[in-house]
Amino acid sequence: MTQSKAVQWLSWLMVGLALFAAGVGLFWQRDTGSFDFTTLRGATMTTYGQGLYRYDSLFKGAGARGTDAVTLGLALPLLVVALLLYRRGSARGALLLTGTLAFLLYVYASLALSLAYNELFLVYVALFSASLFAFVLAFAGLQPLAAAFGERLPRRAIAIFMLAAGLLTLYVWLEPIIGGLVAGQAPRWLEGYATMVTEVLDLGIIIPSAVLAGVMLLRRDPRGYLVAFPLLVILALLLPTIAVQTYLQLAAGVTFTTPEIVGPISGFLVFGLIAVCVIWILLRDL
């Protein structure tokens, strides 16, 4: 398969920028002091008060550091390995590269659009842009691989898993949103922010893509594997992301109920491990 020079240059640019951005976010922890302020909805929000995310809430600031940790420890090493394989013309490398780019696009779209303004705003914009165009070009280059997937793959099981993951995520986000609408109040984790960017990305892009992949596979369209693979990588990397985020949020003083901790982590544990197994099955088939 043909290797895109643009994908390679954009990906190496992302390695450098993400290494810098995630390193600053995780390790620069100058304490400027947290403070309370009244939100647009009349509630009181406490700021994180440390480092790059000092103007974000405790929940979001600590969570962003968790994202930085997983980016440094898992996503960037995976991106480098996938890039090296991609340069050699490896089909598996191309799939892994596209999946890792999808995860980083998801991460930096969230950070660029949802964080309180900070010194790395332009870096986040650059990472969002680079990951978007690199992903589009890499995904377009995957199309010849659709015919390479064999008939012996557990097509129906993978399709059902994609549909289940999409529907479960739909329930997870709609439950607090609809509950808030019924109660006449904003969802709890909106806090002092104007809107919920992660929910926009999940409800508007991730969930429809998962359902589309499942339907395509049920209809025996092998392109469904190409749609599913980036989502599987995102799902696999979200497991350590949610776990590290929760740990740092608890350490920062965020309070959760037991179901709020056990539910997401156990759910992502099950779905994340299944996603890893499906990734392995698809890569082995090439």
Where are these regions (language model features)?
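Alpha-helical transmembrane segments in multipass membrane proteins, preferentially the mid-helix core
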Residues: L78-L84, F135-P144, G204-P222, V276-I279
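Non-cytosolic membrane-interface motifs at loop->transmembrane helix junctions
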Residues: A116-F128, W189, V254-P264
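A loop-to-helix transmembrane entry motif
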Residues: K60-D68, A186-S209
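Alpha-helical transmembrane segments of multi-pass integral membrane proteins
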Residues: L10-A21, F103-Y106, V125-Q143, L153-I178, ...
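Interfacial helix-start motif at the membrane-water boundary
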Residues: G49-L74
